[in-house]
Amino acid sequence: GLAQLFDTLKKGYQIKVLSGDNEGERSTLEALLPKGTELVFNQKPEQKLEFIKNLQQEGKNVMMVGDGLNDAGALAQSNVGISISENVNVFSPACDAILDASEFEKLNYFMKLSKKAITTIKMSFTLSLL
């Protein structure tokens, strides 16, 4: 399930949760996410955008997964922005990819697949120079 996905992702990535909601969801998220995951609540769209910019200024590559139009600025600012949608016709136009909400548990698989694709592209480019 989701807890297993986040445990797997935690091994290779820093997970941070930015939410526009209040802290009423803290206990639910803490039960679902790996221990030590940074949770930041009551975030306005501008604050999410600034948070992403600050991470990038620290030299980090940022992938953001968002579910609403209020995430558009942060999705556009991130190195990779993924919009989660239950209806693929309703999504943020600022994203790089759209992921059907029912497929969210496959996020790690898609990330591995994209890394393999990048490796293939780099190898093909190198071979084309020979």
Task: Give short role names for the model-derived ranges.
Residues 122-130:
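Bilayer-spanning, highly hydrophobic alpha-helical transmembrane segments
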Residues 1-123:
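Conserved ATP-binding TGD loop and adjacent catalytic N/P-domain core of P-type ATPases
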